Structures are given as C-alpha cells and as structure tokens.
A protein has these predicted regions:
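N-terminal carbohydrate-binding/catalytic regions of secreted carbohydrate-active enzymes
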Residues: 24-141
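Active-site-proximal segment of zinc-dependent metalloprotease catalytic domains
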Residues: 149-218, 222
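Bacterial N-terminal signal peptides
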Residues: 7-17
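Short, well-structured alpha-helical segments in soluble
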Residues: 141-150
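Positively charged n-region of N-terminal signal peptides that target proteins for export
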Residues: 1-4
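Post-HEXXH active-site segment of zinc metalloproteases
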Residues: 224-228
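Boundary at the C-terminal end of the N-terminal hydrophobic targeting segment
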Residues: 19-23
C-alpha cells in the first residue's frame, strides 16, 4: 500500500513539473499574425513561406515611410554562378512591379516608390554557417562603414537577397520553412536602417513575390507600429 501511495505521489509530482515547465516556456511568437521574435527578442514581420495573407491590415498609430527606394544587396558566393546571377535583373526594382497588389497598396497610402539604386554584389562564402538576423545587421554595418553601399535617407530600404546554399534563420524560425522573406530595422552609426532579407527560392516568381511584398510591408510598417 505504501509503495502504491509513493508511486502515485511521484506521478503527480512529475505531471505537475511538466505542466509548470510548459507554462513557463517562452511563447514562440507574438499574438499578432505574421510576426515572430528575432534573435534579440524584438518583433519582426515576415512573409510566410506559403505567401498567405492574414486578412485586412490594421493601423497601429506609428509612422510610415513617405517614399521607398530599393538598394539591392546580392549576398553569397552562389550569386557568382551564371545560372543564378541571371535572375538578378528581375529583382533589382521590385517596387516597379506592375499590377502587384502590395505595390498598389503603397499608392493607396500615398507612399512613392523611387527608382532603385545600383546593386551591390558580395560573393562572400556564407554557406558554412547559419545566417541569422544579427549576422545581417553586422554585414550592413560593415558595408556602410566601408561605403560599399550608399548611406540611407528616410526612404532607403536595403533588400538583401541571399544566395542559394545559405541557411537563413530568424530567432527560432528558418527561411524557406517558416518564412519566404522578412523585414526589420536597426539603429547603426549611419542612422535608422530599414532592410529586407529574402532567402533564395528555386521558383523565380515566388522569389520575386516574396521580395516585393516584404519591400511594401517595410514602407507600410517600418518600425512595427504601422499597417499590419
């Protein structure tokens, strides 16, 4: 009888411990749709891997970009391969995509899309380790410090296209599995930097669509308090 009672107490204790651990575990993502936590705990808006939308956007009282101008950064050794490099032309100015509903939404909010700035190709080999958001921020800082890319003005959006073979992560989330693209911002010596990260996708149309949507969402929700 004593053994039965002891076993029951042990089972109850185990169940309580499991429940407590589950309750104490951090929430993997914010309550808002299409937002996740990044590597330092901030909220980041993603384009889901299936490109699904979350319904009508709601305004949260914050600023929008008055204009948006793309600066493309083709990052990774894979872009040096001609079969992939030829795709760059279709990605250089996603804000000029005719008939795209996300670009049309910018016009609805009187956000101008300016002609894209010249691209930068950086063929660094980043295939041996995961590239997280902090890696991206450090790369932007290095490129700005070396003047490899133009310093930002109020409407600059750096769009970073990752080469095939690069494994992108954002907090606990994986590029191509949990998101097709995302946008974020960071304060560096050059000022407030708005940027988009687009993991490579074999399907050129989906690749371009993800980049276009993330670019538009950057202008509509640059600091996390706009339209989303």
């Amino acid at each position: 009888m004593k053994k039965l009672a002891l076993s029951t107490l042990l089972l109850c204790g185990l169940a309580t411990s499991v429940l407590t651990a589950q309750q104490a575990a951090p929430v993997d993502r914010p309550a808002e749709p299409n937002l996740v936590f990044d590597d330092d705990g901030g909220k980041v808006q993603i384009v889901p891997a299936d490109l699904s939308t979350a319904g009508p956007k709601t305004f949260h009282g914050g600023p929008l970009l008055r204009s948006a101008q793309q600066v493309s950064i083709f990052l990774g050794a894979g872009w040096g391969d001609q079969q992939f490099r030829s795709r760059e032309a279709s990605l250089l100015d996603v804000g000029a995509t005719a008939g795209d509903p996300h670009v049309s939404e910018l016009k609805k909010h009187n956000i101008r899309t300016l002609r894209a700035m010249p691209r930068l190709e950086d063929f660094s080999d980043l295939s041996r380790a995961r590239v997280n958001d902090l890696t991206i921020q450090q790369k932007l800082s290095d490129l700005l410090r070396s003047k490899a890319i133009p310093e930002p003005d109020a409407g600059t959006v750096y769009v970073i296209f990752l080469a095939p073979g690069i494994e992108s992560t954002l907090g606990a989330h994986r590029g191509g599995v949990d998101y097709a693209a995302y946008h974020n911002f960071v304060n560096l010596e050059a000022g407030e930097i708005h940027y988009v990260v687009v993991p490579f996708h074999e399907d050129a149309e989906r690749h371009s669509s993800a980049a276009t949507r993330a670019f538009a969402e950057t202008a509509l929700n640059p600091n996390g308090q706009g339209w989303f």
